[in-house]
Amino acid sequence: MTRDQKFALVTGCGKGGIGEALILEYTRRGIYAIATVLPTENSDHLTAAGITWFPLDVTDEQSVVDLKKSIASVTDGYLDFLVNNAGICYTMTAIDTDVSAVKRMFDVNVFGPMRMVHHFHDMLIQATGTIVNIGSIGGVVPYMYGASYNASKAALHHYSNTLRLEMSPFNVKVLTVISGEVGTNILKNDVHRNLPEGSYYSPLAVEFRDHVQRTPKTTSRFEYAENVVAQSLKSSPAAWFWTGSATGIIRFLDMFAWRTIWDFFFYREFNLGKVKDAYLANLKKDM
């Protein structure tokens, strides 16, 4: 049976983020795109755009179960595109990491997509659909202050690799997006974060504050969404699709350069020599 209408489900469609841009792009291309937002999150921007939306907390099993029932009633049991976009960030040095905060982040960034795939896989198989997992260059390179976030995205990348293999008997495709820096508000919860008192990285306290409050050179989220949606609509999408600011050079160096090239680059960019000098000076004081 041929279906004229295709359906997409995009998680994490809060105002100003990648999800909002993705949902609008799928809609523009004639896909019936369904958005999710957190139960506590404002959804006026979706209602105003005529987008069907449902509340979802990807860390809550029952919330995912309830969403599936709602989606199935709209799509008659089919789902052509599942876009696991919901994600949060945690910026901190590895040695100063608050593990409870990291557990929360992994629950969203890693276990969230796992829950979605677990509950929606039958609808995707029914539609011979595509799973789109939104990864990051952070899962490829050791970007400073991002050890925990980078680890969550690396975990998602490797989960996606195996998922791609395991879904192949059912002709369900899995697209992993390696995102560069994109203009979103994902850092909004980090702007007031400081290094803890007494941290070995205290010499970089000012630089750390500047980092979490930075406005990096980024790709427009709408340009990004256009590229991702176009790739997901292909009959044979890439296994890994690199798009966004800085992805070209990072992809090249990751393929052809030695593994520690990033140590050389980031040591200088983030002024780690200042930390070393302070550490050595303290050692001399104690002698």
Swiss-Prot record:
GO terms for biological process: phosphatidic acid biosynthetic process; triglyceride catabolic process. NADP(+) binds at residues 10, 36, 57, 85, 149, 153, 182, 184. The keyword Mitochondrion does not apply. PROSITE patterns: ADH_SHORT. Its EC number is 1.1.1.-. The active site is at residues 149, 153. Keywords: NADP, Oxidoreductase. GO terms for cellular component: endoplasmic reticulum; lipid droplet. GO terms for molecular function: acylglycerone-phosphate reductase (NADP+) activity; triacylglycerol lipase activity. Pathway: Secondary metabolite biosynthesis. Short-chain dehydrogenase; part of the gene cluster that mediates the biosynthesis of virensols and trichoxide, fungal natural products that contain or are derived from a salicylaldehyde core. The pathway begins with the synthesis of the reduced chain in virensol C by the highly reducing polyketide synthase virA via condensation of one acetate and 8 malonate units. VirA has interesting programming rules since the first 2 ketides are fully reduced, the 3 following ketides undergo beta-dehydration, and the last 3 ketides are only reduced to beta-hydroxys to yield the trihydroxy portion. PANTHER family: NADPH-DEPENDENT 1-ACYLDIHYDROXYACETONE PHOSPHATE REDUCTASE, SHORT-CHAIN DEHYDROGENASE SRDE. Belongs to the short-chain dehydrogenases/reductases (SDR) family. This is Short-chain dehydrogenase virD. It comes from Hypocrea virens (strain Gv29-8 / FGSC 10586) (Gliocladium virens). The gene is virD.
